[in-house]
């Protein structure tokens, strides 16, 4: 009987732990689209990018399409590095320029921006990439 109570308590603790893990893991990827778009505007991202059309930089939907089948965590890490390090951006005509570094230093806000871009329904990525 005592063993049965211990097993029951253990199962209850396990169930609560699994439930909390699910809640935190799903809320961790909740995207604030308004905040992301506002941040993109404030940091001048929309001078070179648009949600659904190519400018000097690719459309955000096309970026989402490019990384759709890639490892998500690695993609987020790579794209955060891209917007915070000034690494070279390649243009369709072949020239390269340093990518503008965003002003926002809060990793959560940077991640929200990237998660928003990746959440957009895909466009297409040019075959030349």
Model-derived features: where do they sit?
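Bacterial N-terminal signal peptides that target proteins for export
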Residues: 2-15
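Short, low-complexity, Pro/Ser/Thr/Gly-rich segments in the mature regions of secreted, periplasmic
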Residues: 115, 119-129
